[in-house]
């Protein structure tokens, strides 16, 4: 049974998910997800009865990828999302981009990988107690390291392009959406009333500006991913505990196979 986190329409309303943008800024493609207009403020009100099943489907998609040991990339570079995206991605052992999206981050992965190797090399140089470099040279390397770490620190351990993207504000992250489409990578995206739902495999209609709303989306995403990882671990334990019987001197002995990385993955789940 899928153990996904529970969420209600009340939870969505309390987090301000239903508040859209000014009517003048809307994208007509979002009409199916809009309940009406707040007459005093002239903003669209998002229909949370539509949002809830979309959110549940999106969280199930993240769960499924995590349960198959897939890579999940959180993307949110707007000010309100920076720290939330990073902390929730780290909490569930996944990856994030929260500074700016570098063109080619997906479609030119080899170059990005090379930059990550450079970052690691800089760190080795700076940590070398026997370095013969001058203080000025080390200072220049530290500046370069900081820049690379800010841009790539959240994906340095990813190892390959992700299996799915989780994006806050698909308008702002339109380059990420475009690159994902080119590579056939599905996108879970939070879509406000000014967004374009095209090319988003798992749309979540909702406020993409409110910090409280962003916290809710990211927490649910991380919890769904952790549930998927736990599901994967459970399956691994079942396979692990298949008994292999050996006869030695007429005595049946029982051995258990152990996964090499189980300890590390359990640490991730416990975070």
UniProtKB/Swiss-Prot annotation:
CC terms in the record's Gene Ontology section: cytosolic small ribosomal subunit
Keyword Ribosomal protein: yes
Record key words, sorted: Ribonucleoprotein, Ribosomal protein
Signal peptide stretch: none
Biological process (GO), any one: translation
Gene3D superfamilies from the UniProt entry: Glucose-6-phosphate isomerase like protein, domain 1, Helix hairpin bin
Transmembrane segments: none
HAMAP family on file: Ribosomal_uS2_B
NCBIfam families (UniProt xref): rpsB_bact
Family: Belongs to the universal ribosomal protein uS2 family.
Protein name as annotated: Small ribosomal subunit protein uS2
Name of encoding gene: rpsB
């Amino acid at each position: 049974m899928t153990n996904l986190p529970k969420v209600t329409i009340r939870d969505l309303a309390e987090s301000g998910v239903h508040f859209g943008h000014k009517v003048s800024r809307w994208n007509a493609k979002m009409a199916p997800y809009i309940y009406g207009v707040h007459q005093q403020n002239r903003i669209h009100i998002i229909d949370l009865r539509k949002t809830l099943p979309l959110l549940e489907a999106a969280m199930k998609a993240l769960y499924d990828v995590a349960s198959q040991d897939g890579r999940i990339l959180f993307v949110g570079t707007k000010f309100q999302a920076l720290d939330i995206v990073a902390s929730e991605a780290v909490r569930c052992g996944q990856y994030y981009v929260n500074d700016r999206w570098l063109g080619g981050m997906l479609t030119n992965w080899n170059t990005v990988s090379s930059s990550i190797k450079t970052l690691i090399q800089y760190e080795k140089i700076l940590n070398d107690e026997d370095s013969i470099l001058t203080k000025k040279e080390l200072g220049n390397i530290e500046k370069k390291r900081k820049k690379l770490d800010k841009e790539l620190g959240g994906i340095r351990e990813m190892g390959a392009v992700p299996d799915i993207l989780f994006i806050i504000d698909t308008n702002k992250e339109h380059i990420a959406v475009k690159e994902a489409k080119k590579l056939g990578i599905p996108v879970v995206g939070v879509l406000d009333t000014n967004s374009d739902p095209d090319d988003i495999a798992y749309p979540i209609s909702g406020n993409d500006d409110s910090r409280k709303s962003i916290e809710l989306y990211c927490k649910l995403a991380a919890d769904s991913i952790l549930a998927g990882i736990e599901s994967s671990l459970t399956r691994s334990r079942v396979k692990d505990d298949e008994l292999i019987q050996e006869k030695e001197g007429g005595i049946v002995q029982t051995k258990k196979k152990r996964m090499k990385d189980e300890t590390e993955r359990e640490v991730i789940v416990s975070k």
